[in-house]
Amino acid sequence: MLGKILKKEDCAACRFCCSFRRTSLWETPIFTKENIEAIKTNPSLDETVLNVIEKDGYCFAKYDLSGQYKTDDADEEVPCPYLGENGCILSDDEKPWDCKIWPLRVMNKDGEIVVALTPTCPSINRLEFAYVKDFVSVNLKKDITEYAAAHPFLIKEYRSDFPII
């Protein structure tokens, strides 16, 4: 979604968004029912890494990386199970919405849906916040908030270090 302001090569070389420390497990992506079905039809993908959840009439999935850590080091990172040597191996239909909108996050702040910016993305942090905010506000915010309202299980709780767009 941010392909007009972020270079694909920079993101592919970085991979920061595709690995998780224990403190960032809350950010592992959520897969919609449609993502799950698309993954199931692709024989080259392992669907067993997904924990399917049915809650409040919605079906979605997350993967659990907690057992993948090899040390007690808080800074140890574990990659997404769908991260290949050349980047993400998921097609657009298989890729979770969280990944599609990274480094943006849709969050619940005091009952209001807000679009926020992940403060740790090296690529987006090279850009002026005002520029990113204007781009997102004009081009993406409406679609993102509408999608989130229709898929409330994708909304994460607000964190104060995430600047609101």
Language model: regions and residue ranges:
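Short loop/turn segments that flank or connect secondary-structure elements
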Residues: 1-165
